[in-house]
Amino acid sequence: RFLNAARIADYVHIAEKADCDIFITACSSIGTAVEQCQFMTPLQLARIDCAMVEEAIEKGERIAVLATVATTLKPTLDYVQRKVQQSGKSRTITPILMEEAFHALLAGDMDTHDRIVSEGLQSTFTQADVVMLAQASMARVLQQLPSPPVPVMTSPESGIRWLKTLAES
């Protein structure tokens, strides 16, 4: 974590020199390291999953968080729990880890990856009011499914919508 924060600090300094308006990380695994660097800069630092998490907290009491890698699931769950606590709301968070899907992805077997993610996603529809896909690579599965019965949140979609709102203000 220390190395991540030091590396992120270097990137933040580069972003400042480039006169950027915002520094955003698209990787949940380093989101906490990015947050830890906020004290050192007036530049706005953000996580791509921030909007997704806030929207999920607003949309439902039972939140399922799906991931294919434990190193993404844990920091995402920590972040969701922290944001739930800050909101003052009561939410049940159900983690679902599908490591077999990640192994298939590494092996280049996209069909198996997508099938496992699709099955995991569909299994949550009866136990969650809203589902969060913790990795952008999982969002492609949504194109292969009929319209889900509950909202399914992805960080690229929510994050870009948030950035667009920020840019327009």
What do these predicted ranges mean?
Residues 1-169:
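Non-catalytic structural scaffold of enzyme domains
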